[in-house]
């Protein structure tokens, strides 16, 4: 994450986020035992950084530590430090959250490049290619269109969704759900993230809000399930077996249409 995390942090800072001059927000990073520890860029707001006391293969403990540290009333969980934010993400979340007292705001997932990275890597897509792609796109200059140089993981804004790598809930909802389930103890957390989205959507009185025109963008790296096809298949199979043993059924994609917030117009479609 020495290469990827600084970009992710920068993408969330005021230097890259648009329409957040009046937004009071914080960026928290809880490191799960990286060696070496990542070097973070100076940003506004400054990063609140912590290293977990006991390193664990699963990020669940680190995620829950970060949730406990958070001081805001709407908290976004970013389980993958390699995912950059679209420039409108925080402003759009702020505006969407105002429409419901208990929103479940699920940001769509995209991957940099023209295809799924686990497949593209076999055709030569690597960090150097991605660096050149971002340079050509002009990032981090204002107005950079990362959508034009990325591939969508979901078929449509209202399509079936297994997980969101930037999930925003209120403090009350996070507390009621108990954060991420520590039972997901395998490397990478297995299906802890799909489980979190599923439980949040099913929780009483919450409202799923899908986001149109907003996304996170995955950078290729040596992670557990995104950048190597054979490893991805193996990890998903292992995680599916573990999830099924824990929950009594395989992971299920969220098919509820929910509400749809258009980030470009600020209009909420309640269906």
Which residues make up each language-model segment?
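Conserved donor NDP-sugar-binding/catalytic core segment of glycosyltransferases
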Residues: 88-135
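Short, well-formed alpha-helical segments that are part of the catalytic scaffolds
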Residues: 1-17
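Short beta-strand-to-loop acidic/aromatic patch adjacent to the donor-nucleotide binding site
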Residues: 73-83
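Acidic donor-binding segment of Leloir-type glycosyltransferases
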Residues: 12-53
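C-terminal, non-catalytic tails of nucleotide-sugar-dependent glycosyltransferases
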Residues: 114-117, 123, 127-157, 205-211, ...
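A short, conserved alpha-helix in the catalytic core of glycosyltransferases
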Residues: 161-169, 173-178, 185-206
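Glycine-rich, basic loop-to-helix element that forms the pyrophosphate-binding segment
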Residues: 54-70
């Amino acid at each position: 994450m020495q290469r990827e995390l600084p970009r992710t942090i920068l993408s969330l800072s005021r230097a890259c986020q648009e329409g957040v001059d009046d937004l009071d927000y914080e960026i928290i990073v809880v490191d799960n035992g990286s060696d070496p520890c990542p070097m973070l860029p100076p940003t506004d707001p400054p990063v609140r950084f912590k290293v977990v006391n006991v390193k664990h293969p699963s990020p669940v403990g680190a995620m829950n530590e970060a949730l406990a540290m958070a001081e805001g009333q709407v908290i976004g969980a970013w389980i993958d430090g390699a995912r950059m934010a679209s420039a409108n993400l925080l402003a759009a979340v702020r505006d969407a959250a105002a429409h419901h007292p208990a929103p479940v705001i699920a940001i769509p997932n995209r991957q940099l490049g023209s295809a799924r990275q686990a497949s593209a890597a076999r055709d030569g897509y690597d960090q150097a290619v991605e660096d050149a792609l971002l340079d050509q796109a002009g990032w981090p200059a204002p107005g950079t269109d990362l959508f034009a140089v990325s591939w969508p993981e979901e078929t449509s804004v209202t399509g079936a969704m297994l997980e969101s790598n930037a999930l925003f809930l209120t403090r009350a909802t996070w507390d009621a759900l108990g954060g991420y389930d520590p039972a997901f103890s395998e490397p990478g957390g297995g299906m802890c993230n799909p489980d979190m989205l599923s439980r949040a959507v099913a929780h009483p009185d919450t409202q799923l809000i899908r986001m149109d025109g907003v996304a996170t963008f995955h950078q290729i790296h040596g992670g557990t399930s995104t950048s190597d096809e054979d490893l991805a298949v193996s990890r998903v199979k292992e995680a599916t077996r573990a999830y099924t043993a824990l929950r009594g059924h395989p992971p299920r994609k969220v098919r509820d249409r929910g509400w749809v917030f258009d980030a470009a117009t600020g209009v909420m479609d309640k269906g």
